[in-house]
Amino acid sequence: MTQSVCILGVTGSIGRSTLKILGQHPDKYSVFAVSAHSRISELVEICKQFRPKVVVVPEQKIAELKTLFAQQNISDIDVLAGQEGLVDIASHTDVDIVMAAIVGAAGLLPTLAAVKAGKRVLLANKEALVMSGEIMMQAARDHQALLLPVDSEHNAIFQSLPHNYLQADRTGQPQLGVSKILLTASGGPFLNHSLEQLVHVTPQQACKHPNWSMGQKISVDSATLMNKGLELIEACHLFSISEHFVTVVVHPQSIIHSMVQYVDGSTLAQMGNPDMCTPIAHALAWPERLQTNVPALDLFEYSQLNFQAPDTQKFPALNLARQAMRAGGLAPTILNAANEIAVEAFLMERIGFTSIPQVVEHTLEKLENAAAESIECILDKDKVARSVAQQYISSIGG
């Protein structure tokens, strides 16, 4: 019997990799619903191949999609719009597995809807957990949802932890003999740049990651190390561990995807070629394993693996994220919102690369923190933080 999959963000990098895995295992999985934001022609090609029952696009893309469907004689796919449509497909009774791969805060409500519907949720949208934190984790416990990490680092940590770790008490302290999590970072394309060189970085340069094929936003986040900061917050929530038990290690080759240290002196690592198909396949099939076309790691290709501490003087975003996690409450929401606005401004060449963390720091300092008591107050603070960040960008000439 096949399992029914909903892919939120199907035309993005994670969505396309997910389709690649599903296409290799039609006996195990079928595509029930997909969503896309802007690449409508690509979405139509996906629909022709995988024949989902439902598609969700923004309201302003409905007419374009229906026109293309008519040209291709596609009449058996329901079309829904906007956030309401995303929530509908993420929580649909016919869906078994939800791939949460929408980038940014836009993925929060549909991801939470999938969790509250008790789905197996493959979490690629780190921003949803950064914003909602313990609300999301409590919802997963209350509704018996299975929240499995797809980020290569968190998937590596999950594989390196004891098999029953997620069922351990959520105390903020390491459990079951774990002493520390080592979260690896490639260091991004500007690892060896000077501060002076970083000032002149272009969006085109920032979007060229040395090891991974990714979308624009996450590529820029990787270049600033904000991606690692967001992943640190995500790790703290997923694995119920305080931030001072998580150490970021720069590992330029991206072969070791993260590590877990134990009280007996052991360090367990998950290794593999940098290909998102591996963690996606793992999360889809866990606790079983799926065949993929990813080649096994050839250790003889690597004469050495390098590790170093991150330079937080050059890349202050990492410390900003750590401080936001330490502060708790709505601070991670403010951090994420300001970063999304700053990255968008950088990609539009309104601000420089080194201004991205400045926008985030200003917004964190400007806004008062408070307890994250509900999704409504999180969304309200997200909106305010975006406005403050926009105002600051305008004030510095962006």
Curated annotation (Swiss-Prot):
Q: Where does NADPH bind?
A: T11, G12, S13, I14, N125, E127, G215
User: Which residues are listed as membrane-spanning?
Assistant: none
Listed GO biological process terms? isopentenyl diphosphate biosynthetic process, methylerythritol 4-phosphate pathway involved in terpenoid biosynthetic process
**Which cofactor does this sequence's record say it needs?**
Mg(2+); Mn(2+)
Reactions catalysed according to its record? 2-C-methyl-D-erythritol 4-phosphate + NADP(+) = 1-deoxy-D-xylulose 5-phosphate + NADPH + H(+)
Keywords linked to the UniProt accession = Isoprene biosynthesis, Manganese, Metal-binding, NADP, Oxidoreductase
> InterPro entries in the record, alphabetically?
DXP_reductoisomerase, DXP_reductoisomerase_C, DXP_reductoisomerase_N, DXPR_C, DXPR_C_sf, NAD(P)-bd_dom_sf
| Residues that hold 1-deoxy-D-xylulose 5-phosphate according to the record | K126, S152, E153, S186, H209, S222, N227, K228, E231
The protein's annotated pathway: Isoprenoid biosynthesis; isopentenyl diphosphate biosynthesis via DXP pathway; isopentenyl diphosphate from 1-deoxy-D-xylulose 5-phosphate: step 1/6
Q: What class of enzyme is it?
A: oxidoreductase
Query: Where does this protein hold Mn(2+)?
Result: D151, E153, E231
Tell me a Gene Ontology molecular-function term this record carries.
Answer: manganese ion binding
Q: What is its EC number?
A: 1.1.1.267
Q: So what family is this one in?
A: Belongs to the DXR family.
Q: Read off the NCBIfam families from this record.
A: Dxr, PRK05447.1-1, PRK12464.1
Query: What is the documented function of this protein?
Result: Catalyzes the NADPH-dependent rearrangement and reduction of 1-deoxy-D-xylulose-5-phosphate (DXP) to 2-C-methyl-D-erythritol 4-phosphate (MEP).
Q: Which PANTHER family match?
A: 1-DEOXY-D-XYLULOSE 5-PHOSPHATE REDUCTOISOMERASE, 1-DEOXY-D-XYLULOSE 5-PHOSPHATE REDUCTOISOMERASE, CHLOROPLASTIC
HAMAP family named in the record: DXP_reductoisom (MF_00183)
- What name appears for this protein in its UniProt entry? 1-deoxy-D-xylulose 5-phosphate reductoisomerase
